Regions:
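Alpha/propeptide regions of enzymes that mature by internal proteolysis
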Residues: 1-46, 51, 73, 89, ...
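Acidic/polar, glycine-rich intrinsically disordered N-terminal extensions of enzymes
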Residues: 1-73, 77, 81, 101, ...
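Solvent-exposed alpha-helices and their adjacent loops that cap or buttress functional pockets
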Residues: 55-59, 66-68, 106-109, 150-151, ...
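Conserved phosphate/anionic-ligand binding catalytic regions in large, soluble enzymes, centered on
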Residues: 60-84, 178-186, 252-278, 358-367, ...
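C-terminal catalytic subdomain
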Residues: 276-280, 288-388, 392
Length: 424
């Protein structure tokens, strides 16, 4: 059944729930969970963290009509920032018309490290460790046999000498973690390897730990957008495309711009990571390290022009070692619901959706910046927050926002005064 999302953003909260039910996007059980606003319980929260005194909520939204590799998705977003969902929805709709996103997973492995120091003969130690690679991989797999049964496990091992104030001999373990992110898995394997590596190197082990710089879990998303989709006026569409390509170059050249450029990308990525129960801090750390791989901090996405085909071409590659199993994913009702909304994707499929949405978010931001300016769409949503802060009820928000925008006055004192006038 073809789903129509026309006017979804204009509907009331209740009408949106009714549309989800009518289109059977969720199982009856999950539909009920959503309608009853079922959240993680304090009892469960108390087992997940420490010193718990309650739970904390954020807006839960949907970005419809996201086309990735020919498959259409309804993507859950968790974010409190105004205009992020609107921008993602706008961009995804344009990109869908242009053919959607193409995404691919280059590899799906995690990397862990054992750092050795006080190694008297690093070259000899390196040779010894490499010569025992097969035995070390077997030992790692014995430490976590369940992943081997699921088709994963330790796949490779290499050694590097790191020169510095203190010299380190670092052993890198590459592990196929299947559907899990694999932090506990990697750390368990590395702990098992430490005493053997100390013996082989005749050195001391400083630590064994997963790395969040997941260069073995790279995902690329790309899209091609004809100039005509950027504006109703052909010449203006080309001009916008040219400016977006220049904005991309600016983010490659200037770290001050790159930081904001990448923050905008993560407006979308973090929203999905949170919704799907993934560790957004780990993903951000790895991506920002990846943005600095050439020795200076750069924008993660690139937009170029294909003048022959009259298209704007976007592409982004970054580490995306997300999980669909493990951690707290199965314990939070809203996270379980998110996975169902997406069609219960595999970890690889989810990674492709997430990177595509990061590129979508970036498209929307750059297009706004080089044309209407970022504030035009952003301000109306910011003013809604101001109206709520002033104490407006649901029925009072729209007229108060309209008045504030008309008067171009955006402060709490004025909003409260206008609200009093509205009520009198």
């Amino acid at each position: 059944m073809k789903i129509s999302w026309n006017g979804f953003s204009k509907k009331s909260y209740q009408e949106r729930l009714e549309q989800l039910q009518a289109q059977a996007l969720l199982s009856p059980e999950k539909q009920t969970s959503l309608e009853q606003d079922e959240q993680i319980s304090v009892t469960v929260a108390d087992q997940l963290s420490e010193n718990v005194v309650g739970t904390f909520s954020l807006p839960y939204s949907l970005v419809p009509e996201v086309l990735v590799n020919g498959q259409e998705y309804t993507v859950p977003y968790v974010t409190e920032e105004p205009s992020v969902v609107a921008a993602a929805s706008y961009a995804s709709k344009i990109i869908k018309r242009a053919g959607g996103f193409t995404a691919q997973v280059h590899e799906r492995q995690m990397i862990g490290q054992v750092a050795l120091y006080q190694v008297a003969n690093p070259e000899q130690a390196q040779e010894k460790i490499v010569s025992k690679k097969a035995e070390l991989l077997e030992l790692a797999n014995q430490a976590y046999p369940s992943i081997v049964k699921r088709g994963g496990g330790a796949r490779d091992l290499h050694v590097e000498q790191i020169k510095g104030e203190t010299d380190f001999l670092v052993v890198y373990l590459h592990v196929d973690t299947q559907e899990a992110m694999g932090a506990n898995m990697l750390n368990t394997m590395l702990e098992a390897l430490k005493p053997v590596l100390e013996e082989l190197s005749q050195g001391q082990s400083l630590m064994g730990i997963l790395s969040n710089y997941a260069t073995d879990s790279l995902v690329t998303a790309s899209c091609r957008i004809a100039f005509r989709y950027l504006s109703r006026q052909k010449d203006q569409g080309r001009e916008i495309a040219e400016k977006m390509a220049l904005a991309s170059q600016f983010a490659q050249a200037d770290p001050y711009r790159a930081a904001t450029h990448n923050k905008g990308i993560f407006n979308g990525i973090d929203a999905i990571l949170i919704a799907t129960g993934n560790d957004w801090r780990a993903i951000e750390a790895g991506a920002h390290a990846f943005a600095s791989q050439d020795g200076r901090y750069q924008g993660l996405s690139r937009w170029t022009l294909d003048l022959e085909r009259e298209e704007l071409v976007g592409e982004m590659t970054l580490p995306m070692p997300v999980a669909t199993k493990g951690g707290s994913i199965g314990l939070n009702p809203r996270v379980v619901l998110s996975h169902e909304l997406l069609g219960n994707p595999s970890a690889k499929e989810l990674a492709q959706i997430i990177v595509s949405m990061g590129l979508s978010q970036n498209f929307a931001a750059l297009k706004a910046l080089v044309s209407t300016g970022i504030q035009q769409g952003h301000m109306k949503l910011q003013v809604k927050s101001l109206a709520l802060l002033a104490g407006a009820s649901e029925s009072e928000v729209a007229p108060l926002v309209e008045r504030l925008i008309a008067e171009k006055t955006f402060n709490l004192e004025t909003a409260q005064r206008y609200l009093e006038n509205l009520r009198s």
